[in-house]
Amino acid sequence: VAAVVDRLIEVGLVDDESYAQSAVRYCVGRLMGYRGAVMELARKGVDRPLAERVCDEARMSGVFEDAAWELGRRSAAKTQGMDPKVRKRRFWSSGGRKGHDAETLRAVAHELFD
């Protein structure tokens, strides 16, 4: 079995880093934050150091912040006409569930809901 796995790695059919990068793209498509993406990668079997490294690279390129803003825009559209406190609470809840950090959520909420 080890020889087969080694051969698959050698020919490029098994590449953990490419898989992790693909999984991060999937997470961003679902508007997840850094913490949520790391947890999702770990759930999918990516070892934690690799998951954190790939997510750090994605964070540096700003994709998680972009995802938070898109989440905020969608939340604002869905809750239009509701009480402002309800709108903020729903946004914060969804952002927290998706693993966004409080600093980013605060900036988005201030801009879109205040």
Where on the chain are the PLM-derived regions?
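An alpha-helical, amphipathic repeat domain used for nucleic-acid recognition
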Residues: 1-114
